[in-house]
């Protein structure tokens, strides 16, 4: 019986050491050495203080800032612990109420409503944490942000263009604009 358990205990100990200690330690070391920014959460700083991650959206609702997608997390917007979609189907009246509420907020903030509203400004993403919007959603907000900040619309457009990322490897995903990075650049523009 003793001979039966000895190999099992040895295999268990070796696999625990390899998969539970050695592999995570090596991957952590490689991540820190080769991809330090990403391994530490892709944090963004302003005036030497961490203000957020470029991977997690933040709530912006003041007219002088670009607004991101709606957050489906509750009870607080952009709460990473509550990540998940709203699960509201296209025929659910609550989804329509949510969309109407966002359109009303855009009107109240002074957005020109003569153009069609980009869908990503009035719907939440699958995770509820999306940090990016489409270039169309950013362009839709340029006039409002420029007016609120007393800037030329062309200057704000140039900033949007600068912070627009293309498709990954030229084929994956869609062009996108990181809202937090764009808003931080706007704040720098005002201070600088």
Curated annotation (Swiss-Prot):
Domain of life: Bacteria
Gene Ontology CC annotation, any one: plasma membrane
Species, as recorded: Paraburkholderia phytofirmans (strain DSM 17436 / LMG 22146 / PsJN) (Burkholderia phytofirmans)
Annotated keywords: ATP-binding, Cell inner membrane, Cell membrane, Ion transport, Membrane, Nucleotide-binding, Potassium, Potassium transport, Transmembrane, Transmembrane helix, Transport
Similarity comment text for this entry: Belongs to the KdpC family.
Cross-referenced HAMAP family: KdpC (MF_00276)
Gene Ontology molecular functions: ATP binding; P-type potassium transmembrane transporter activity
Keyword Cell membrane annotated: yes
Name of protein: Potassium-transporting ATPase KdpC subunit
Function recorded in the entry: Part of the high-affinity ATP-driven potassium transport (or Kdp) system, which catalyzes the hydrolysis of ATP coupled with the electrogenic transport of potassium into the cytoplasm. This subunit acts as a catalytic chaperone that increases the ATP-binding affinity of the ATP-hydrolyzing subunit KdpB by the formation of a transient KdpB/KdpC/ATP ternary complex.
Assembly and oligomerization: The system is composed of three essential subunits: KdpA, KdpB and KdpC.
Compartments where located: Cell inner membrane
Transmembrane segments: 7-27
Pfam family, one: KdpC
């Amino acid at each position: 019986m003793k001979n039966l358990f000895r190999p099992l205990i040895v295999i268990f100990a070796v696999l625990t050491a390899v998969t539970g200690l050695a592999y995570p330690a090596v991957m952590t070391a490689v991540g820190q050495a080769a991809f330090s920014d990403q391994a530490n959460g892709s944090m963004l700083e302003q005036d030497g203080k961490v203000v957020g991650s470029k991977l997690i959206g933040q709530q912006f609702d003041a007219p002088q800032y670009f607004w991101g997608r709606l957050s489906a997390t509750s009870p607080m917007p952009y709460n990473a612990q509550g990540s998940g979609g709203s699960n509201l189907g296209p025929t659910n009246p609550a989804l329509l109420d949510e969309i109407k509420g966002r359109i009303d907020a855009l009107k109240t903030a002074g957005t020109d409503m003569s153009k069609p509203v980009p869908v990503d400004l009035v719907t939440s993403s699958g995770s509820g944490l999306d940090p990016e919007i489409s270039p169309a959603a950013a362009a839709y907000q340029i006039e409002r942000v420029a007016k609120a900040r007393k800037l030329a619309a062309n200057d704000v457009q140039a900033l949007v263009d600068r912070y627009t990322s293309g498709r990954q490897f030229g084929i994956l995903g869609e062009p996108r604009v990181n809202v937090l990075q764009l808003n931080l650049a706007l704040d720098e523009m005002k201070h600088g």
